[in-house]
Amino acid sequence: MEKQVRVRYAPSPTGHLHIGNARTALFNYLFARHLDGKFIIRIEDTDVKRNVAGGEESQLKYLKWLGMDWDEGVDVGGEFGPYRQTERLDIYKKLYEDLLERGLAYKCYMTEEELEAEREGQIARGETPRYACNHRELTEEQVKEFEAEGRIPSIRFRVPANRDYTFKDIVKDEVAFHSNDFGDFVIVKKDGIPTYNFAVAVDDHLMEITHVLRGDDHISNTPKQMMIYEAFGWDIPQFGHMTLIVNESRKKLSKRDESIIQFIEQYKELGYLPEAIFNFIALLGWSPVGEEEIFSKDEFIKMFDAARLSKSPALFDSQKLKWMNNQYMKKQDLDTVVELSLPHLVKAGRVGETLSEQDQAWIRDVIALYHEQMSFGAEIVELSEMFFKDHVDYEEEGQEVLNGEQVPEVLRAFAGQIEALEVMEPAAIKAAIKAVQKETGHKGKNLFMPIRVATTGQTHGPELPNAIALLGKEKVLNRLQKVIG
């Protein structure tokens, strides 16, 4: 009988949920759900200095917002807990003490200064820096001497000599490392806290993880973890290392690159939809069969095949994300779109926090004008700018339109029609434009474009009669007058 698939997402609580980490979580989630397996969340919090207050809560909150759930973890429990590494220190202690007893690990008393001097010497000689194993075979006398000096040891794993470590990677196929390229590596720091590679190998085994899907920046950790598995006689899980995410310059996505929004929390704040972000991330380094790109969560679960994970870097295309979110925005009801947009108009000072019924209805109609066009909630501030200004500026293309010979005649006639209207409604404005056509003989672009540019300042935009109705009589007449002179 085959083992049940068990995968994990194991973030460090060092900050908010990044797009790259979200992708790792998502691919593990889809892999588990597709194969009726278990998805586990484990918190790797042993690097206490880097942990951020609220980091763990933020990770979990935004994974949930994206639509993921998990079977075991810090907040839901499970039979393989605890799921927070700082609560597993006794487990690690028993195991590294076992390695020490069997001579597969040893105490290293070298100071940071000695290690740095060794490293600098290797670089000066043109060698690849690695620990030279100086404290591998210390005598009892040397140990006593170091301890008398007050030196606190770290614990290093004794790397086997002349060994090949190969594994079949789910993404990269055959991957090979040679043990002679590694120095003996630290498995327990001087403060008694296990290092990443030791704790991860122990946790993955004890939690019965069958597949480890992670970013390929972890690939060099894999042979070290394999050595630890081997030292304990444990079965090695299957590894899959997903390619990097790159920006439009084909450089690795860096958290320091502020030209790209990279944290899930920021997308939520901007009024993006979780389903769209889920969809977009699922296609960052994985592709379905066929050309279709819009899928529901259930569709992704049904068709997810790890064999289709890409070997090439995944391009983070911000414009494509906007396009994708727009596809999802179009499907939302107006209430949802208002909910995503209105807070941004309040924040920009366009409307107050409390609105009269009349103002609520008006702003709802303004947002409705852009429902089909809007990429994300915050975009409403820029899109609807013309409704909140007394005067409009004309783009170069718009100015050319207003230079037409027929423009004064068309705009005067239209101003007369608007002046006569008792109620500014789209149907009445449509009728007014038709009346101008009859009166002046101008039609098509020669009729519509001057009216659009003079009233909205734009050559393209929402339905003209609806926009003019919402602008209101006073604003429209003022703008027409400004052009007529």
Swiss-Prot record:
> Tell me, what is an example of a GO biological process annotation in this record?
glutamyl-tRNA aminoacylation
- The motif 'KMSKS' region: which residues? 252-256
Query: Which cysteine pairs are joined by S-S bonds?
Result: none
Q: What is its main location?
A: cytoplasm
| This protein's UniProt keywords | Aminoacyl-tRNA synthetase, ATP-binding, Cytoplasm, Ligase, Nucleotide-binding, Protein biosynthesis
- Which Pfam families does the UniProt record give? Anticodon_2, tRNA-synt_1c
The subcellular location is:
Cytoplasm
- InterPro entries the UniProt entry points to: aa-tRNA-synth_I_cd-bd, aa-tRNA-synth_I_codon-bd_sub2, aa-tRNA-synth_I_CS, aa_tRNA-synth_I_cd-bd_sf, Glu-tRNA-ligase_bac/mito, Glu/Gln-tRNA-synth, Glu/Gln-tRNA-synth_Ib_cat-dom, GluQ/Sye
A GO CC annotation given for this chain = cytosol
GO MF term (any one)? ATP binding
Q: Which residues bind ATP?
A: 255
| Enzyme Commission designation | 6.1.1.17
User: Enzyme class, one word?
Assistant: ligase
Which superkingdom, per the lineage?
Answer: Bacteria
- For whether the record's keyword set contains Transmembrane, the answer is no
Does the UniProt entry include the keyword Ligase?
A: yes
Question: Where does motif 'HIGH' region map?
Answer: 11-21
Reaction(s) this enzyme catalyzes, per UniProt: tRNA(Glu) + L-glutamate + ATP = L-glutamyl-tRNA(Glu) + AMP + diphosphate
The UniProt entry's sequence similarity note says: Belongs to the class-I aminoacyl-tRNA synthetase family. Glutamate--tRNA ligase type 1 subfamily.
Summary of the function given for this chain in its UniProt record: Catalyzes the attachment of glutamate to tRNA(Glu) in a two-step reaction: glutamate is first activated by ATP to form Glu-AMP and then transferred to the acceptor end of tRNA(Glu).
- Oligomeric state and partners? Monomer.
Name recorded for this polypeptide? Glutamate--tRNA ligase
Species of the source = Bacillus cereus (strain ATCC 14579 / DSM 31 / CCUG 7414 / JCM 2152 / NBRC 15305 / NCIMB 9373 / NCTC 2599 / NRRL B-3711)
